[in-house]
Structures are given as structure tokens and as C-alpha cells.
């Protein structure tokens, strides 16, 4: 198939569910070419549904990372001078190619990450929307002008690229998060060194093939693989001016501090504990269905998953009905038709999830739905956890204070809306939250008083479309400018202000002016 021609026939493993005793290797992408790494250190990537190795990812050597960076630096000199219409044209082509190949991208995501095919297509689609927004770059990157700020003097601002930027992406959205990063970076005239998660490299590599086909010049985006050494290289390299990161708290704080100390601009999206507040006047059927989907979809591995529910007053009587809906969700391999909940990413992740469930039980929570011992016929070696619900949870319990990142919903109870708002605001995270109600006054009170960056009213996962920005706050984000939207443009650009004077009289100065200019 033409889609994979540049990577080579051996790359068909990226989208086909076939395994071999000698797993193929994932390439680096440097200067427009897919390059075999010379490293001696490799990381196995497992299909979460089968535990079989699908590819081996290199830990790029220092020389390889430096080569990629030099390619980015060289490409910036020419790419930043291309017309904005040329950069826009690449986005138009990339957008069309992603649409055309969405199914192939989704197959790879399901194979490496585990989520259902429908959810994987959503992963690609939400990233595609950022590409579509970047097609408006001539309007998004406009500066400002004030004519005649003084006699014969004009001042205007230019929105300029930074230089070489870097992106460090997580495992849970193999296509969406890289597409939050490199399209905005390169359309504004930067180049990017991208490090996808070593657990799910395939989607990024397929996107690089599409980027080549879209006509993006060599070196504008390069891809390296690795773990700590690759992260440190990105944080320390003087040529890299800005770093985008999405992932865990520990990594996000480390990258923000290390890169920041080296003078880099950083945006760091980290952990979350998103609450859904359910009032008794809500539409019961819609609310419970939305809760189940938002809590257990993608096996709970979304930074905007509703992992916590606060039932207010009489709505607490709906909890058994929620359990009934969760029990009906089908747990299976992501590529199997009808699957609602796929596996989690790894055996270690499954163990951590199970340990947090057990900690809740030991601390006094009620385990009203237990998915720990689920077995999926034909996929007994997969990393499965079924939908799990812990009720009567208190804010001091470990299952509440830590991000579980699995198909686990913890339930708290509140007597009234004020108490529910206090619970949400006392949590250190501020990624997102939602309220379910038919009362406009209650919804308005919630929106005004809640301390979270993204708020849904009868919308369980309020991730904004890219004409807005992804605006997590408090413990969920570090940095000054958020991802995509207007803030994303600001993150990847800097302002150059020009003041020019052309005297109408064109009279030559007869002597130097040493007094402070007053702009009159």
C-alpha cells in the first residue's frame, strides 16, 4: 500500500495483527528519512491485549539525537522564511491525508495502545481538528499595527517563530497529542524534535510518512525514541527553545523544572482527578450513561476521564443504576467488534490499578463493582481490568488522592451543591470537571465557583475544540500558555515590535539628537 511505501514493506506490522518471533524495529525519523538506529539498547512494545511483542523501539544514541537536532536547526533557517501560504498548504495536504488514512492509523493505535477501534478513530479525529485549525494560520499569526503613533512614525508587531522546539508525548493518545504539538509548531514557522511515548511509537511514525507526502521539507520534524536520556537531551540542548509535554505528574514537574532552568519555554500538562457532580434534578438516564462512558471509556486512560463522581442529595439513590450500566459494558480486545473497554497499557499499570483498588477497600470504601479478576476468552494474557466502582470514598483515601488512570470510578457523597463544590475545589488538580443538572441557576453557580480549567455542563468530557485552548489549571498544568488555540499560537511564537520613522519632509539631520525620544 502506498501509505507505507517510504517506511518499507516490513512496516506492515504497524497496522496488521500479525506477530513473529523476531519483532521488527521502529525507526528514527531524521531529515525526512526513516533511519535504523545503531543503538544497543532496545525497548519491547507489547500488544496490551495479547502481551505479544509487536515491535522494538530504540533508545536513540547521543550522536543520533544530536544529528536530529542539527537537522532541525538547519531546516529552521529555510522553513521559517517560507511564505505563510506555503506552510498553510502543507497543513491542507496533511489534513486530507489523515482523513484518507484514519482507519490505518486507528488500527495501529489499537494494536499498540489497546483502545477500541472506535475510540482510536476518535483519537485521530481530535488531533485532525488541530491540523484543520492550523489551516487558518494566515489569520492566526497576524500581528498588530498602529499608524502615526507619532508624526510620520508607525509601530507594528510581528508574530515570529522561536526556532527549534520539542514535543514529548504520552502513551494514552498516540495520535492526538503529537497532533496537538507539531502542526502548531511548524505552521508558525518553527521546527520540532518529537519524542513519542516509547510504548506507542507507531502512530507518530505513520504521521511522519503522511507529513512527507504532504510536502513538508526534510528536517522540519524529526523523531527520536527513548526514555530518560532522550528527555534530558531535550531539556538540556541549548538550541531547543520550547518544550511541550503531556504525561504524568512526576515527569511533568521534572521536565518543567529542568527545561525551565535551561531557559526554555515549557508547557506541561500533567495528572488529573476529574469530578462529575450529579444533582438530583439531572436527566437520570442521560447522566448515568454519560458517567459510565466517561469513567470507563479508553479503560479510564484519559487525562480528562471522569474518575470521580460526587452524588448530591437524592441523586445518591441512582448509584445502583450506575453499577448496572457499568456491568453491561463489554471488556475485550480493542479490535473485537462490540468492545466497550479494552486493556490497560501494561502489566505494571494493571498491578498499580489493582493495588489502588485494594487500598480503597482497606481504608473503608465499599467495592460495589470489582473488575480485577476479569478474564477475556482468547486473550488470557492481556492486561485487562473490568469496570470497577468504589463507593463511600472520602477525600483522605489513597484511591482518591492519587490518579488511578484505569477503569475505576470512585464515588463521594455530598448533601448539597455547596459541599460538592468544596470537595472539587479542595482537590489539588484542576484539569476538568462537569455538573449534571437541569437547573440553570445551579449550573451557573457551579461554573462561577468551581476552580478547574475546563468545565462541562451536562458534558462529561469538556475537551474544547481547537479554536479554544486546552486549559487545565492548578496541579494539572505548569506553564504560561496552553495547548492549541490562540494560546498554542502564543506558545510557539514571540513578538517582534518595529517602530519606523519616515519623515515626510525628508530633511537631513544636521546634528545628533541626544535627548530621550518623546515620540512627538
From Swiss-Prot:
Ranges in a coiled coil: none
Sequence positions that bind NAD(+): 169, 171, 195, 198-199, 248, 403
Principal EC category: oxidoreductase
Keyword terms of this UniProt record: Mitochondrion, NAD, Oxidoreductase, Transit peptide
EC identifiers of the protein: 1.2.1.27
A Gene Ontology molecular function term of the record: malonate-semialdehyde dehydrogenase (acetylating) activity
Major localisation: mitochondrion
Cystine pairings recorded for this chain: none
InterPro entries hit by this protein: Ald_DH/histidinol_DH (IPR016161), Ald_DH_C (IPR016163), Ald_DH_CS_CYS (IPR016160), Ald_DH_N (IPR016162), Aldehyde_DH_dom (IPR015590), MeMal-semiAld_DH (IPR010061)
Gene3D superfamilies reported in the protein's UniProt record: Aldehyde Dehydrogenase, Chain A, domain 1 (3.40.605.10), Aldehyde Dehydrogenase, Chain A, domain 2 (3.40.309.10)
Gene Ontology biological-process entries: thymine catabolic process; thymine metabolic process; valine catabolic process; valine metabolic process
GO cellular component, one term: mitochondrion
Record field: catalytic activity: 2-methyl-3-oxopropanoate + NAD(+) + CoA + H2O = propanoyl-CoA + hydrogencarbonate + NADH + H(+); 3-oxopropanoate + NAD(+) + CoA + H2O = hydrogencarbonate + acetyl-CoA + NADH + H(+)
Active site: 303 (nucleophile)
Subcellular location: Mitochondrion
Function: Probable malonate and methylmalonate semialdehyde dehydrogenase involved in the catabolism of valine, thymine, and compounds catabolized by way of beta-alanine, including uracil and cytidine.
PANTHER family (alphabetical): MALONATE-SEMIALDEHYDE DEHYDROGENASE (PTHR43866), METHYLMALONATE-SEMIALDEHYDE DEHYDROGENASE [ACYLATING], MITOCHONDRIAL (PTHR43866:SF3)
Family, as annotated: Belongs to the aldehyde dehydrogenase family.
Quaternary structure, from the entry: Homotetramer.
UniProt-recorded name of the protein: Probable methylmalonate-semialdehyde/malonate-semialdehyde dehydrogenase [acylating], mitochondrial
Organism (species): Drosophila pseudoobscura pseudoobscura (Fruit fly)
Amino acid at each position: 500500500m502506498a501509505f507505507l511505501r517510504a517506511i518499507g514493506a516490513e512496516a506492515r506490522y504497524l497496522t496488521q495483527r500479525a506477530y513473529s518471533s523476531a519483532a521488527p524495529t521502529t525507526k528514527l525519523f531524521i531529515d525526512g528519512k526513516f533511519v535504523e538506529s545503531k543503538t544497543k539498547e532496545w525497548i519491547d512494545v507489547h500488544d496490551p491485549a495479547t502481551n505479544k511483542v509487536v515491535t522494538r523501539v530504540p533508545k536513540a544514541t547521543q550522536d543520533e539525537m544530536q544529528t536530529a537536532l542539527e537537522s532541525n536547526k538547519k531546516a529552521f533557517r529555510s522553513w521559517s522564511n517560507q511564505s505563510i501560504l506555503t506552510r498553510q498548504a502543507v497543513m491542507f495536504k496533511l489534513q486530507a491525508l489523515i482523513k484518507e488514512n484514519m482507519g490505518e492509523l486507528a488500527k495501529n493505535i489499537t494494536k499498540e495502545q489497546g483502545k477500541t477501534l472506535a475510540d482510536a478513530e476518535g483519537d485521530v479525529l481530535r488531533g485532525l481538528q488541530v491540523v484543520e485549525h492550523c489551516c487558518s494560520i494566515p489569520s492566526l499569526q497576524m500581528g498588530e499595527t498602529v499608524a502615526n503613533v507619532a508624526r510620520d512614525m508607525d509601530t507594528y508587531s510581528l508574530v515570529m517563530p522561536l526556532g527549534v522546539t520539542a514535543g514529548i508525548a504520552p502513551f494514552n493518545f498516540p495520535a492526538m497529542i503529537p497532533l496537538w504539538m507539531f502542526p502548531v509548531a511548524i505552521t508558525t514557522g518553527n521546527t520540532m524534535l518529537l519524542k513519542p511515548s516509547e510504548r506507542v511509537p507507531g502512530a507518530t511514525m505513520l504521521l511522519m510518512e503522511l507529513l512527507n507526502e504532504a510536502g513538508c521539507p526534510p528536517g522540519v520534524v524529526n523523531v527520536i525514541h527513548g526514555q530518560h536520556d532522550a528527555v534530558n537531551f531535550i531539556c538540556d540542548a541549548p538550541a531547543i527553545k520550547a518544550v511541550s509535554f503531556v504525561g504524568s505528574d512526576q515527569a511533568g514537574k521534572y521536565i518543567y523544572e529542568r527545561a525551565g532552568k535551561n531557559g526554555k519555554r515549557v508547557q506541561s500538562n500533567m495528572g488529573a482527578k476529574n469530578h462529575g457532580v450529579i444533582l438530583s434534578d439531572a436527566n437520570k438516564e442521560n447522566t448515568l450513561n454519560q458517567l459510565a462512558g466517561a469513567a470507563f471509556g479508553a479503560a479510564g486512560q484519559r487525562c480528562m476521564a471522569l474518575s470521580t463522581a460526587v452524588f448530591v442529595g437524592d441523586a445518591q439513590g441512582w448509584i445502583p443504576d450506575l453499577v448496572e450500566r457499568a456491568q453491561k459494558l463489554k471488556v475485550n480486545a480493542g479490535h473485537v467488534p462490540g468492545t466497550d473497554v479494552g486493556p490497560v497499557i501494561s502489566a505494571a499499570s494493571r498491578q498499580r490499578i489493582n493495588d489502588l483498588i485494594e487500598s480503597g477497600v482497606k481504608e473503608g470504601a465499599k467495592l460495589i463493582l470489582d473488575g480485577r479478576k476479569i478474564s477475556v476468552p482468547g486473550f488470557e494474557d492481556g492486561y485487562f481490568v473490568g469496570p470497577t466502582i468504589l463507593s463511600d470514598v472520602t477525600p483522605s483515601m489513597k484511591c482518591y488522592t492519587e490518579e488511578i488512570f484505569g477503569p475505576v470510578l470512585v464515588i463521594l457523597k455530598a448533601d448539597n451543591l455547596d459541599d460538592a463544590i468544596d470537595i472539587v475545589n479542595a482537590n489539588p488538580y484542576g484539569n476538568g470537571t462537569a455538573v449534571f443538572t437541569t437547573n440553570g441557576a445551579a449550573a451557573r453557580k457551579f461554573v462561577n465557583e468551581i476552580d478547574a480549567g475546563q468545565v462541562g455542563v451536562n458534558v462529561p468530557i469538556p475537551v474544547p475544540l481547537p479554536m479554544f485552548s486546552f486549559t487545565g489549571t492548578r496541579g494539572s498544568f505548569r506553564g504560561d500558555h496552553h495547548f492549541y488555540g490562540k494560546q498554542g499560537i502564543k506558545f510557539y511564537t514571540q513578538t517582534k515590535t518595529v517602530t519606523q520613522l519616515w519623515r515626510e519632509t525628508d530633511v537631513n539631520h544636521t546634528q545628533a539628537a541626544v535627548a530621550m525620544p518623546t515620540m512627538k
